[in-house]
């Protein structure tokens, strides 16, 4: 039986742990540095069908129905008014029990960890990693040690374990924007479609709103281009950058606000150990403009599990090359979206809106731009 150590109890780490748990050839232990698993209960996520299909392998299709939502469209709006530019029918990519899904991150985490409680050890932070004859020895700050055959690192964008493995201080880079999120409880006068995804494109900013369950709760995320500052007056920033463009948006930001600087990965790393692998944000963190963060975490976990279970030769290189190819595909689209969502020149905005009307109805374009991502696995 092979021993597998998984560092980080996030989406990718918990998902691959579920896959290993269903295979008697592996013994898993999940380590997390926090005292409790971070649920981030107010945080909504989107899952495209490439990840929903994989989650169904661990019975996500039986997930409590009122705690998730299946939007059918993305509605595009400009900053000038509440009039819709066009919409994109994402349900065209759906099939049977595999549909574009939105939900709270905390609900997905609870689903992923419900059968793993006996395999999770919290308050474990790695201080040292050694290898001897293909066995990796982990030493934690509490002086506990653990020997494993495979080490899977999924402790997020600020992965401390990656720095220990590579023996260098590896940090993500600030991408020049700030993310703000809040939860909205829909009312009769809510100006947008509460059953679908709304994308409001502004000058140097954009807002995404989508339902996260069948209880009329919506997640709002606002991305604003902003130089890095340690202290920011959120209300003043929103008033200056958002409300100045459209006062109709004021009622969207009345609830509790949370914010964080957006970091992305400078470049992916191939682990120095042949039996150690990076997953999720520890491998690569995308700009949040393609809604593929969670889906790519799930996809990469399934990809790695498949390669390991098939005893693939030259495993490290095969996995890294597959992930690198996938990253480039998603990242190119994320960067293009980031640029096009934030246009400020009136002529460019007019041209973008015209193209959106055409492209969102072009089957050939959508199959290339989205289908290559949504339908890969």
Task: Enumerate the predicted regions with their spans.
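Conserved FAD/dinucleotide-binding core of flavoprotein oxidoreductases
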Residues: 84-100, 104-109, 185-259
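Glycine-rich FAD pyrophosphate-binding loop
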Residues: 21-41
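Conserved Rossmann-like nucleotide-cofactor binding loop
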Residues: 12, 36, 158
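Conserved N-terminal helical subregion
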Residues: 4, 21, 48-165, 170-183, ...
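Conserved N-terminal glycine-rich FAD pyrophosphate-binding loop of Rossmann-like flavoproteins
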Residues: 36-54
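Conserved mid-domain beta->alpha element of the FAD-binding
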Residues: 5-23, 152, 257-343
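C-terminal auxiliary extensions adjacent to catalytic cores
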Residues: 353-377
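Residues at the starts of beta-strands that form the adenosine-phosphate
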Residues: 3, 26-27, 217
């Amino acid at each position: 039986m092979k021993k597998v150590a998984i560092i980080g109890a996030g989406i990718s780490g918990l998902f691959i742990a579920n896959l290993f748990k269903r295979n008697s050839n592996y013994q898993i232990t999940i380590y997390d540095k926090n005292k409790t698993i971070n649920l981030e209960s107010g945080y909504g996520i989107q899952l495209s069908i490439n990840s929903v299909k994989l989650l169904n392998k661990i019975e996500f299709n039986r997930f409590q129905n009122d705690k998730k939502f299946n939007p059918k469209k993305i509605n595009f709006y400009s900053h000038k008014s509440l009039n819709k530019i066009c919409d994109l029918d994402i349900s065209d990519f759906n099939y049977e029990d595999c549909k574009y899904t939105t939900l709270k991150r905390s609900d997905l985490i609870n689903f992923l960890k419900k059968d793993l409680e006996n395999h999770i050890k919290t308050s474990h932070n790695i201080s040292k990693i050694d290898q001897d004859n293909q066995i990796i020895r982990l030493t934690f700050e509490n002086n506990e040690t653990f020997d494993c055959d495979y080490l899977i690192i999924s402790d997020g964008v600020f992965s401390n374990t990656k720095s220990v493995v590579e023996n260098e201080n590896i940090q993500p880079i600030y991408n020049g924007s700030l993310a703000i999120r809040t939860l909205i409880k829909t009312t009769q006068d809510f100006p947008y479609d509460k059953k679908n995804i709304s994308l409001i494109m502004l000058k140097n900013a954009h807002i995404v709103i989508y339902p996260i369950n069948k209880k009329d709760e919506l997640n709002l995320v606002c991305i604003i281009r902003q130089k890095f500052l340690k202290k920011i007056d959120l209300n003043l920033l929103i008033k200056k950058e958002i409300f100045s463009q459209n006062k109709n948006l004021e009622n969207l930001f009345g609830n509790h606000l949370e914010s964080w600087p957006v970091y992305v990965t400078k470049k992916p790393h191939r682990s120095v150990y042949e039996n150690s692998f990076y997953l999720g944000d520890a491998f690569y963190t995308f700009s949040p403009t393609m809604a593929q963060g969670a889906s790519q975490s799930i996809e990469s976990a399934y990809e790695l599990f498949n390669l390991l279970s098939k005893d693939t030769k030259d495993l490290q290189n095969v996995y890294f090359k597959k992930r690198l190819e996938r990253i480039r595909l998603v990242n190119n689209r994320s960067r293009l979206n980031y640029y096009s969502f934030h246009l400020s020149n009136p002529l460019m905005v007019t041209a973008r809106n015209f193209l959106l009307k055409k492209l969102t109805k072009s089957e050939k374009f959508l199959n290339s731009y989205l289908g290559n991502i949504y339908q890969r696995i």
